[in-house]
Amino acid sequence: MNVKGTENIVRFTLGTRRKYLAHVSTHTIVGDRSYDPATVFRETDYDVGQGFEHLSYQRSKFEAEGIVRQAKDQGLVWNVLRPGQIFGEASTGAYPLGHSAVTGLFYDIWKTVLESRVAYLSNVHFDVVPVDYVSRGILELGIRAGENFQTYHLTNPHVVRYTQVIETLAETGYPIELIPQEEYERRIHERRLRWDGTDYKSSTTSAFRWWFKRGIRLTDGGYTCSAHTANLLEQRGVRCPRIDRRLLGTYVDAGVAAGYFPRVPRKESGRAHDMEASA
């Protein structure tokens, strides 16, 4: 769909007066180079020798972006926008949790951690970018574009690692055990992750089990640099919030209110303790 659909869109756009296309790609076209801690994927990069084994979605987006780029020779005028890992609206946490059968991998990762109360240690960079920042970025740099043939990274310029994200989630009041990835893998294979006294299962645990069986390790990796894009947007009054307790707490609260995330155990809740102390 990504490839054929893009071909159709390019064909249609070439028949318009302006021949202009704001193409929404993804930062994950970096493919397996994201596993390399030496990788810094910049807006000026496209083909960096990446592979796509077991990464069919990323391959299709890479090919689709290539179609757009090559269509410049046919007269297509374009800008490419590469969003990161999109979460809810920054101030309210609003996100269509539970409104469809597919909630999203990144939310399911958090749900798995909060319910099983276990996560593995990892230095992989984990992007958390609010949907309103992404949408405003597309509007400002894609629709109100001052330049053409540019690529913009709509990821959070505040770069953090997976373990930092989990530690921040724990600060909102959830007891989370952080263990080495090897131990987490054993628990996955031996079905020792528990929820309400039963074997814990989720889309995330299924994905991890699949990755681990194929020798894919998620211990470290490169990151997507969005400093240039963030600077341009800041000049237009568009700022991305940092990945901190305030932002993650907003997402957690919204998820709890929607019945998607489990509630913080009251006796272990830092928030509840703070409320009682201030009463």
Set out the residue ranges of the language-model regions.
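A conserved pocket-lining segment of Rossmann-fold NAD(P)-dependent short-chain dehydrogenase/reductase
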Residues: 48-52, 98-133, 137-141
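Substrate-binding strand-loop-helix patch
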Residues: 123-136, 152-175, 182-199, 220, ...
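Conserved Rossmann-fold NAD(P)-dependent oxidoreductase catalytic core, especially the SDR/UDP-sugar
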Residues: 4-56, 79-80
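Conserved beta-loop-beta element that borders a ligand/cofactor-binding pocket
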Residues: 62-97
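Conserved catalytic Lys-bearing alpha helix of Rossmann-like short-chain dehydrogenase/reductases
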Residues: 3-9, 60-68, 109
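Amphipathic terminal alpha-helices
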Residues: 223-279
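Glycine/proline-rich active-site loop of Rossmann-fold NAD(P)-dependent oxidoreductases
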Residues: 88-105, 141-152
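Conserved C-terminal active-site "lid" loop/helix of NAD(P)H-dependent oxidoreductases
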Residues: 131, 163-164, 190-237
